[in-house]
A protein has these predicted regions:
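Short, small-residue-biased leader/transition segments that mark boundaries at the very start
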Residues: 2-7
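Glycine-rich, charge-decorated loop segments at or immediately adjacent to ligand/cofactor-binding or catalytic sites
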Residues: 24-46
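Conserved functional hotspot residues or short segments at active or partner-binding sites
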Residues: 133-231
Length: 231
């Protein structure tokens, strides 16, 4: 849900409806399209990183989201055509032939995105400014960690969080792809970092609620709840 493509598509559909233009979506597979996970967006947290009331991992293709947006009234009625993908089902294991973003350079990063994206709403780095963004996390004050990295300016992150500071944390880049594909919207990593840093509410920023889509996840993490209890 946090990726901005579906938000831009909905805005384009609204603009086409206003000007009487047809919309044609050439559909593509979703590499995380085999499951649904995470909270449905509470629309009071609607923002540029979440504008539709769908789960964090929605499992839909762009064409399916476009149809749903029109059908549910989330987008203005428009002349919509979706050109379907041949031989694709939601059980298809699909590896993207081209990286969708400089910050999602590998299949592992794509699979771990849902679990690591909430760090964008915390003081922790998720590896922007390294060669393995979304495959690690860390902070200068994390303790008892042997892995370290230092964020530097890159093509995909000119001024990454914690730029130039040595961060200690966790390296997930060696996780087998099959295991990474099963992680889903896991809060285990955020809970781990929050407990380690012992910063209380200062661990989070207002962006956290916009990313997870609800207000009670932060509260439960700070109360010491486990991932299973939060789910």
């Amino acid at each position: 849900r946090q990726r901005q493509m579906c938000i831009r598509d909905r805005r384009m559909m609204d603009a086409c409806a206003d000007f009487g233009r047809a919309v044609v979506v050439l559909d593509r597979p979703n590499p995380n399209g085999s499951y649904i996970d995470g909270p449905v967006l509470d629309m009071k947290y609607k923002s540029g990183v979440g504008a539709l009331p769908i789960p964090v991992v929605h499992g839909l293709t762009m064409g399916e989201i476009a149809r749903m947006a029109v059908g549910e009234g989330w987008a203005k009625p428009c002349d919509l055509t979706v050109v379907k993908c041949r031989n694709y089902t939601h059980a298809t294991e699909y590896l993207l032939p081209v990286a969708p973003s400089p910050n999602l350079p590998t299949a592992r990063a794509v699979y771990l995105y849902a679990a690591l994206c909430p760090f964008e709403g915390t003081v922790v780095s998720l590896g922007r400014g390294t060669d393995k963004p979304f495959e690690m996390y860390g902070h200068p004050d994390m303790t008892g960690r042997t892995f370290s990295f230092t964020p530097r300016p890159t093509a995909g992150a000119k001024h990454p969080p914690l730029e130039g500071r040595l961060c200690r944390g966790v390296d997930l880049s060696g996780m087998p792809l099959a295991e990474a594909r099963e992680v889903g919207f896991s809060l285990r990593y955020v809970i781990d970092a929050c407990a380690d840093l012992e910063m209380g509410d200062k661990f989070f920023t207002p962006m956290f609620e916009k990313l997870v889509g609800v207000g009670w996840v932060r509260e439960m993490i700070l109360a010491g709840a486990s991932e299973a209890e939060i789910r």
